[in-house]
Amino acid sequence: MRKTRFLTALTLCSLFPVSLTAQSITPVPIPQPMPIPHPVINISQPLPVEVPLPHVLPVSVGDYDRDLPVQEQETIQKSFSFSGAPHKSLEIDNVWGSIEVVGTNSDQVQLTVNKATRAESKDKLEQARKEVTLDITEQQGLLKLYVNGPFRCHCDDGCGHREFEGYVVKMDFQLRVPRDIDIKVKTVNEGRVVVRDINGSFLVRNVNGDIEMNNIAGSGTARTVNGPVKVAFRQNPQEASDFQTINGNVELRFTQGLAADFRFKTFNGSIYSDFPVTALPVRAVQEEHRGAKVVFHADRYTGVRVSSGGPEIKVENLNGDIRILENHE
């Protein structure tokens, strides 16, 4: 087994575009190459940048640790049929809790939700029953599961910060679905996302928790903020894919015969590859004028090619390592 290791010192600015006023523009030092182990990759100079924090938390994480003596447990079980549907899609929009999706050879969807409510009083428990609901939308070939409540807003992320309501409702989703299904699933707090045995496209998001995917044969995006991202492919992706975290390692496992173009970003971490790679040229910096401002979109990715190249696979993190490994399972 040949493992290629190349240390990187990529910058925080590589994660976000930099906006400068026309009066405050100063010359940017030309990036200088650094000698590192094979393959040789040029490392960019650091630039200051301000990192926006995620704004998707419905309540603070500490709310779940409050003294909430009144508790209630409930199990929701339902089944749905995708028989005869030419295209199958699943969407889950959770807030508190985990998500597990496992592919099967059946056309049926088996849903189990373990709902746990913790409240300050019986009145608050009754309030939680009324305010927090699981909305289910079933159409031809499409199943949507949406956790609704007073924490929801009409912003792009679907939830916003509110004062503590006096209760916390956690829903853990477990689903058995057809293998050839496209999935869009996300959660925010107190849960991990696990996906196994899926052949379709995927969009997987988390905030405070890890993402683990195994035996995957599709292409897509997996992103979290606080936690690792681990994906093992049964069949290498045929289309562009994207994997990202801020605090955690990213570990991707591919089968033999991998041919792809990788573009990496990391700040505090190293990049490892089981596959021999060759360096790709650095892409040009893009400059955009917006009135009195000049916005620089600098491509600070480290680009490498595996074999003859193929779909572009982007991998980003801030604090953690990136590992590109060969899947022997």
Model-derived features: positions:
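Intrinsically disordered, low-complexity terminal regions
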Residues: 2-329
